[in-house]
Amino acid sequence: MAELLTLARPYAKAAFAYASEQGATDNWSNALQVLSAAVQDEAFSAYLNRPEHTPAEQVKLFAKVLGEDQSQAVSNFLTLLADNDRLVLLPEIAAEYEQLKSQNNNNVDVVIESAFPLTAEQEQLLKSALEKRFNSTVTVSVEVKPELIAGVVIRAGDQVIDDSALNKLEKMRTRLLA
């Protein structure tokens, strides 16, 4: 997964830089989401990756998927990906693109994993603290994961704050076995 993200990052950065320059970040975002969904579809992906399809034919297939939403720039981007055998990276490129778009809008997407459901008040307190820490607007999504036993794990981009009982027990176990 990290390997795919490493390969996808330069493509996402280039797409975002171009889209920002053209004032078309939302159009590119929509196109990348559609393309990402298409690549993740098993039947479409199997057909797309047939050996007899040239990169140009693969781009034509995506043109049919996007329809009117495909600009010349998106077509050129797809050609670049197809020529370098990187179409499989589209989901990672789309995710990285969205992250760049959020950062540009001074917004951070945060996932809070909690052992128990959070009350609205707890969620708001965490959101306020995270907005202060990241100095930007925070969009929070909460996931309940009972295996954490107690506490929370906060994920914001590539940063992780793990204050779960599971993590503390793992650290204790490591120290005892050392």
Swiss-Prot record:
It comes from Acinetobacter baumannii (strain SDF). It is a peripheral membrane protein. InterPro entries: ATP_synth_OSCP/delta_N_sf, ATPase_OSCP/d_CS, ATPase_OSCP/dsu. F(1)F(0) ATP synthase produces ATP from ADP in the presence of a proton or sodium gradient. F-type ATPases consist of two structural domains, F(1) containing the extramembraneous catalytic core and F(0) containing the membrane proton channel, linked together by a central stalk and a peripheral stalk. During catalysis, ATP synthesis in the catalytic domain of F(1) is coupled via a rotary mechanism of the central stalk subunits to proton translocation. GO terms for molecular function: proton-transporting ATP synthase activity, rotational mechanism. Keywords: ATP synthesis, Cell inner membrane, Cell membrane, CF(1), Hydrogen ion transport, Ion transport, Membrane, Transport. The keyword Thylakoid does not apply. It holds the Pfam family OSCP. The keyword Cell membrane applies. GO terms for cellular component: plasma membrane; proton-transporting ATP synthase complex. This is ATP synthase subunit delta. It is found in: Cell inner membrane. PANTHER family: ATP SYNTHASE DELTA CHAIN (PTHR11910). F-type ATPases have 2 components, F(1) - the catalytic core - and F(0) - the membrane proton channel. F(1) has five subunits: alpha(3), beta(3), gamma(1), delta(1), epsilon(1). F(0) has three main subunits: a(1), b(2) and c(10-14). The alpha and beta chains form an alternating ring which encloses part of the gamma chain. F(1) is attached to F(0) by a central stalk formed by the gamma and epsilon chains, while a peripheral stalk is formed by the delta and b chains. It comes from the Bacteria. NCBIfam families: ATP_synt_delta, PRK05758.2-2. Belongs to the ATPase delta chain family.
